[in-house]
Curated annotation (Swiss-Prot):
Mg(2+) binds at K201, D203, E204. InterPro entries: RuBisCO (IPR033966), RuBisCo_large_chain_AS (IPR020878), RuBisCO_lsu_C (IPR000685), RuBisCO_lsu_C_sf (IPR036376), RuBisCO_lsu_fd_N (IPR017443), RuBisCO_lsu_N_sf (IPR036422), RuBisCO_lsuI (IPR020888). This is Ribulose bisphosphate carboxylase large chain. It is an enzyme of class 4 (lyase). The gene is rbcL. The disulfide bond which can form in the large chain dimeric partners within the hexadecamer appears to be associated with oxidative stress and protein turnover. The active site is at K175, H294. It comes from Tsuga heterophylla (Western hemlock). Residues 1-2 form a propeptide. It is found in: Plastid, Chloroplast. The record marks K334 as: Transition state stabilizer. Belongs to the RuBisCO large chain family. Type I subfamily. It catalyses: 2 (2R)-3-phosphoglycerate + 2 H(+) = D-ribulose 1,5-bisphosphate + CO2 + H2O; D-ribulose 1,5-bisphosphate + O2 = 2-phosphoglycolate + (2R)-3-phosphoglycerate + 2 H(+).
Amino acid sequence: MSPKTETKASVGFKAGVKDYRLTYYTPEYQTKDTDILAAFRVTPQPGVPPEEAGAAVAAESSTGTWTTVWTDGLTSLDRYKGRCYDIEPVPGEESQFIAYVAYPLDLFEEGSVTNLFTSIVGNVFGFKALRALRLEDLRIPPAYSKTFQGPPHGIQVERDKLNKYGRPLLGCTIKPKLGLSAKNYGRAVYECLRGGLDFTKDDENVNSQPFMRWRDRFVFCAEALYKAQAETGEIKGHYLNATAGTCEEMMKRAVFARELGVPIVMHDYLTGGFTANTTLAHYCRDNGLLLHIHRAMHAVIDRQRNHGMHFRVLAKALRMSGGDHIHAGTVVGKLEGEREVTLGFVDLLRDNYIEKDRSRGIYFTQDWVSMPGVLPVASGGIHVWHMPALTEIFGDDSVLQFGGGTLGHPWGNAPGAVANRVALEACVQARNEGRDLAREGNEVVREACKWSPELAAACEVWKEIKFEFDTIDYL
């Protein structure tokens, strides 16, 4: 143990404030396979050296406090402290740098995303010595990830449950998101599922409001999907949002969904909280329910480049906490999402092993071992003209979700669903025949219009719709 980090009581106690870097900046440290590693984008206050700022992040997110305390002598800081082990500049940003911090595994409760985040992204984000702080990535070691159940079922089990293979799944968010009665809501669900969609969805803020109580919605939606299943011969689902004001109420809704025999429920995992989400995920695995996750509130946390937390971290947290689907941006629609960044965290959701790749924002190699994968959901401002790009970008293991792009069809909900299903089938067939969807996608859609009047009408309505804004989150 070096003199700088000696903590034995025999050394004696000297009160006062000391530099964080004397204890928590350790560039000679060799990271362990069991360490949780973090990459922080740090913007220190003027005059604060990078080493001191990086050490402050390590200290305040682990064992440190602002002054020396005599109880330091009652434990071994070398065993429990976080360490800033590397600092690298951010190209083009003179006042920013990336601080790499290693945390010993014993700092965290097993199977608890709540505890993990309370430490790593807790009080340190309000630290006065820092102008801004952003958590860019985490490396979760197998020794820790194996303490989590993870997704209730995962990609392959979901495909087996639905008996659907070789293509992305199709969904639709029912609109208007608020104000419909339960019966009219169920009617919209039925029309969309009958037209060819695999799923329909409650919007994230549909819970149990005066115009539509949750139990009524659940009953009418279950009736709609059973009727659509009988007519189409396909397994259908509706994401019944179980999010509620208390965990007890959330579980009551999930239990009722199971009693209705529906295949899937939904949760808003950030507004609902990780403790509630993990509780629901465990119930879903035990009772055969798929779990769709909405990321409402994520942009409050992840959209600013200098402060907060990147969505790739929230995606990893969700995979550990549990969910079979999660919204992940579209690249081409109305919501934020640069292509390489989006594909980086899509791989972190789906794959077992993801190599470090800074060109896609992946700071650490991530080994999920046997944890099931999560289907990314592309949703937000997409329509039939986006189908070739979405198929090419996200591949088969995804859910493509068209709300306005289904319900906005001039002939109604069912024709809107038909248009999306025909466009998807045409794109998948063209891809399987070796055609380049990135180059020939529009031609593929136009050809399909010749034998689908529903698709032709949709193409005419949305031919001029574009969302041309620069992305904020870029590499």
